Amino acid sequence: MGRGGRWAVALAAAIVWVGGASCSRNREQSQPFYLRSEVGSQGPEFAKALYQTVSTRMVPGNRLRWANNGAVFDVMEEELSRARSSINIVLFIWRPGQASERILSVVTERARAGVACRVLVDPLGSGPFEKDIKPRLEEAGCQVHIFRPLPADENLARNHRKIIVVDGRVAITGGLAIQDEWLGEARNEKEWRDTNARVEGPVVAQLQQAFAENWQESTGELLPSSDFPALGNSEPSLDEVRDGWGGFVASTASPELTRAERLTQLMVRAARKRLWIAQSYFTPNEPLIALLVEQARAGVDVRVLAPGDKNDHKSITLLQRATYSTLLAAGVRIWEYQPSMMHAKTMLVDDRLVLVGSINYDALSFNLLEEGSLVLEDQEAARGMEAFFLEDLKHAKEVKAR
């Protein structure tokens, strides 16, 4: 069974599993999790709400550059080639092809030059990796491990994070994968549409920590202290200028309530004027649907960009469309991306707050997967996301209520 088939089976099994877990949760709680408190989308109010919700501290002094579609490989090559001390990579998908050859070339060259290279991949997403790619990395001196090895189909708690950290100073994250579908410019179904970010600054230590916890589980090893350079030692004041404040939220499996679900609801709740969502697997659960409905009825400009018929999992398209009538009736506007698979997982909240990462609105991300998303309060980053979201809508078809 190929990757797509195994992933579809995993999602179906997750829905059944989550149904049982939800029943268990409901016996202990009077109702499913629903974030009721209002919260602002910027400044100390949001930063404190984020800390309460997922234990992530917003830190200042970060700079973000968008790296969408095939441009992410240019950014990866550029940053990896600059590595002097360490390269740490955790990915759900790394598969043979042109994209793989580009990254292999840089990583193996750096490893042979003495850079400590650590690679961790998930076997469910990366099928041929262990046979075709792992030996070449190891021959060059890289440490390579498979996260929770096969039979992966018997363990749905997979690693869906997409994190690359170079020298502890620069990180790349988003919906990315090392696979040829990510190389192009989303012009046709062979070139996927995705959103990624390069970030530098103190928040990189939080992405490094997310890698470190997965590496420790797989190897029993800690990263050296040199992988956490001092990028800002002083305790920040929440009253400082807000541009460049960011935090990385790492989520792990739980039968009760994950940080992925908590974070998603917090971002939705924070919106006062607009909430623009790009979501590759849009199958929100009932509490999230209710929250989106509430925000739309309160006058928030709620827009959802999801895949259309080019979705790589047709069964998810059916589940996705089953949510439309309730959302449309409340005033949520929905578009389906037409040229190719739309794989982004982003949120734009009001005028300053953005999210980019690996979290999907589905039963797997909210319950079973290792996930991670970057949250950044930054006006320039928000303007960039606004621009490419509007550009994406030009290539999408708006769904109308029947």
Enumerate the predicted regions with their spans.
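Bacterial N-terminal signal peptides
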Residues: 10-18
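Bacterial N-terminal signal peptides that target proteins for export
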Residues: 1-9
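Intrinsically disordered, low-complexity segments enriched in polar/charged small residues
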Residues: 8-11, 166-167
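Charged, low-complexity intrinsically disordered terminal segments
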Residues: 20-402
